[in-house]
Amino acid sequence: MLDLTELENSLGVKFEQPSLLEQALIHTSWVNENPNHSSGSNERMEFLGDAVLGVIFADRLYHDFPDIQEGDLTRFRSLLVRRESLVRVALGINLGKYLYLGRGEDVSKGRFKPANLAGAFEAVLAAIYIDKGMDVTREVIFRLFKTEMERVQTLSSNIDYKSRLQELIQAQLQLTPRYRITNFSGPEHNRLFIAEVYAEDRVFAEGSGRSKKEAETNAAKVALQQFENSFTDEDNI
């Protein structure tokens, strides 16, 4: 058995059942060359880890972004759980060093193959989940995925509210929304603009921002929320 103390330190987890972590590192190629090994490969744990990772991020996104719609939430989750993200995290904790690989797989640089790294990392998450439970697994994931989560935060602030509002108003009212700056204040280097979104003689909402574009975007966001809330209220009648 490999000494996995360094890996445990990287994960921030001391296993009650170290055999679970070892199991998570066993590739099918190693099992093929060691048929007497009783516990098999890490594939079943990979399945569980994938599910745990998905539900933890789904829960986080749902609570962090209450104003973002299902389609965007799905896109954000996909960014977080995609193979590239898993590989980056796996490389960051030097996971490939600990993999149990068959000789041929090892010679063919299997310790650096994205599929091997991503699968083993998901299996490691399953091992943590089984050994420590959901809360500890959540803490590990949020710490290791900090960079990916910061990227999602940035993306969430750049959602095209104006396009979504236009689609909604055109579909519901057969009107095209327009924007105008109605006021501004402050010195030239630090202006605060007020914009409103309207169609014909109807004003839907207003928003503010440090640029005209930001003010228009915020006006669209407010209007979109109002429209969506009104549709929800109608559905509940």
From Swiss-Prot:
Subunit structure: Homodimer.
Binding site for Mg(2+): 46, 122
Family: Belongs to the ribonuclease III family.
NCBIfam families per record: RNaseIII (TIGR02191)
Natural source organism: Dehalococcoides mccartyi (strain CBDB1)
Main location as per UniProt: cytoplasm
PROSITE patterns: DS_RBD, RNASE_3_1, RNASE_3_2
Organism placement in taxonomy: Bacteria, Bacillati, Chloroflexota, Dehalococcoidia, Dehalococcoidales
Matching Pfam families: dsrm, Ribonucleas_3_3
GO biological process, one term: rRNA processing
Role this protein plays: Digests double-stranded RNA. Involved in the processing of primary rRNA transcript to yield the immediate precursors to the large and small rRNAs (23S and 16S). Processes some mRNAs, and tRNAs when they are encoded in the rRNA operon. Processes pre-crRNA and tracrRNA of type II CRISPR loci if present in the organism.
Cellular component annotations (GO), alphabetically ordered: cytoplasm
The keyword Metal-binding is annotated on this UniProt entry: yes
Entry protein name: Ribonuclease 3
Catalytic activity: Endonucleolytic cleavage to 5'-phosphomonoester
EC number: 3.1.26.3
Residues in DRBM domain copies: 160-229
GO molecular-function term, one example from the UniProt record: ribonuclease III activity
Active site: 50, 122
Record bears the keyword Transmembrane helix: no
Keyword terms of this UniProt record: Cytoplasm, Endonuclease, Hydrolase, Magnesium, Metal-binding, mRNA processing, Nuclease, RNA-binding, rRNA processing, rRNA-binding, tRNA processing
Domain RNase III: 4-133
Cofactor dependence: Mg(2+)
Subcellular location(s) per record: Cytoplasm
